[in-house]
Regions:
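Hydrophobic, aromatic-rich alpha-helical transmembrane segments
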Residues: 27, 31, 57-61, 65, ...
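Membrane-embedded catalytic cores of phosphoryl/pyrophosphoryl-handling enzymes
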Residues: 92-171
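Transmembrane helix-loop junctions in multipass membrane proteins, especially transporters and channels
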Residues: 53-56, 83-88, 147-152
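Interfacial segments of alpha-helical transmembrane regions
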Residues: 45-74
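Structural signal for the C-terminal ends of transmembrane alpha-helices
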Residues: 24, 49-56, 124, 171
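N-terminal transmembrane-helix/juxtamembrane module of multi-pass inner/ER membrane proteins
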Residues: 1-44, 59, 75-101
Length: 171
């Protein structure tokens, strides 16, 4: 089936069909979302532990603070300004993830944050960074399957996280 976003409820039903047939998968999806939203900030904390144990100077630590922080602030301001409704607000769908907020769907801040954290890790260790990047992609998938973001929300957020993380190579 080719996705037709003009009929998002039909696309979402198709996307979540494996979950409607096996309800325990919904619990796995919800737990995965919860775990990843805790793991990614934990990974960011481990970045600073790594920098501390490597006795990195403040000048070396500073980019790991200002690049993610400035990106997060600018990203949040843009997101607030465009204020796109979430899929469950616009369409008659029942999301698999609980979300009580409205608007601010585009782009996904969870995915942007996870991606920029992964870019931090890439600066320290490419193999660990790639593992972290896979977690950010998994989070993107979970957010779409969960019905709290459109595919474009997470793809744009992931791309912006990669682009903003490119600042590491400029400093």
């Amino acid at each position: 089936m080719k996705p037709n976003l003009q009929d998002y409820p039909k696309f979402y039903r198709w996307l979540t069909l494996p979950f409607s047939r096996k309800p325990h998968r919904v619990q796995v999806l919800q737990r995965t979302n919860r775990i990843l939203t805790f793991v990614m900030p934990g990974i960011y904390g481990l970045v600073f532990c790594w920098l501390f144990f490597k006795k990195t100077s403040m000048g070396g630590i500073w980019p790991f603070i200002w690049i993610p922080a400035s990106g997060f602030v600018l990203f949040s301001l843009f997101r607030h300004w465009v204020n796109v409704p979430r899929p469950y607000e616009k369409w008659e769908i029942q999301p698999l993830l609980e979300k009580n907020s409205s608007g601010h769907s585009f782009p996904s801040r969870h995915v942007f944050s996870a991606t920029i954290i992964s870019m931090c890790v890439c600066q320290l260790s490419l193999p660990f960074g790639m593992c972290s990047m896979l977690l950010s992609l998994l989070l993107a998938l979970v957010r779409v399957l969960g019905g709290v973001h459109y595919p474009k929300d997470v793809l744009v957020a992931w791309g912006l996280g990669l682009a903003w993380g490119g600042l590491f190579w400029l400093v």
